């Protein structure tokens, strides 16, 4: 007898092909976590607001208001296909009804006053003070807009359907005045035109590292400077943009967003693709042999994909195949450089909530708002690549062993382990035996030249395998 040990577990990595270069790197990792090399069920989602947002909810935002006494009130806001609603007094209330969707939001605070600014690029920009029953037009707004950012004490805005290449900025400390100032131009407002002459339009903007990044569908620009008299715009090297501007997320001094070929990374004046190629099934159309591969990123992702950064991880809600709505969430751990997928709920948008932004919320396709990272667990799966144990000769597997704990209602068989070769497969079940760690060893006999192992858990199961995976061969 010989033993083959996979000492720890990782996320998805198909960069080395289907045959194991690293057996710990999964072919598929769904609704699991591999933190610290352990394989565990991922925390799931539970309803945060059970009442569905009305009218085809598309986006989510959390607006916080703090009064003069320091009392903080948090409002969950949803953008629908034609309106913006807020949840308060136990129900959804309409703040504004427009003629289109795709809303953008920005919180602005001046002294003791907080306002929510929002727009869709078609209707007049609106603002809400957190107390009124409805929103009102933002006084002084020079145009329509749907992408907003705060940068050097000014509100920046773009996305006007009539001027798609124009970037507007307000006066310092005054979102209600966007006019220029002849006497002291450094205090005035104005606009900057950003044509690229290749058909690209602005898809989002964000402040990062003291500069302003403007994403376009075909490229990206960086605006730097502290006042109108020294603003300069440079085109970033890399020739990379995105049609999915809502996926933009910032961590530290770096911006991230989803493109058709992978995750874009913006650092300073350079934009590149995240150089790991671990997800060709999702981002490389030539990887799948089938036509219209259902596992690849949908070409329609620009109209629905969303992203956020939360606790050193990026979360991207994405559509697959030919879908026009999101069906999976891609999680990328920035510290460990690992990917896992989640499909418990179809997510339309994300938002952070709580005093320290410690809670991650998601807007589901059903219009409900969910809290992510709860005790609920979805069905989970982790699959190895093909393993040939270093030789193409015939081999026989005799057993596998996992060390850890399982918990499931009713102590029914809750984890299924499938060992497969080109000759067939063997299936064994593991029962929940309480919260204590235990050795789970199952015997079988299966011959072949190469093998792979699939570990699957039913919904509601909590598991954590801490000692890797051991295979016995002869």
Task: Enumerate the predicted regions with their spans.
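Beta-sheet repeat architectures centered on beta-propellers
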Residues: 1-96, 100-111, 239-254, 261, ...
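Beta-propeller and closely related beta-pinwheel folds
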Residues: 45-56, 96-103, 135-302
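Short beta-strand segments and strand-loop junctions that repeat across beta-rich extracellular domains
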Residues: 83-88, 125-129, 165-186, 222, ...
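Acidic/polar residues in short coil/turn loops that connect beta-strands
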Residues: 89, 120-123, 129-132, 188, ...
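Short coil/turn linkers that define WD40 beta-propeller blade boundaries
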Residues: 92, 133, 228-229, 337
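Hydrophobic or amphipathic alpha-helical targeting/insertion segments
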Residues: 106-138
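A short, charged
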Residues: 113-117, 122-126, 152-156, 160, ...
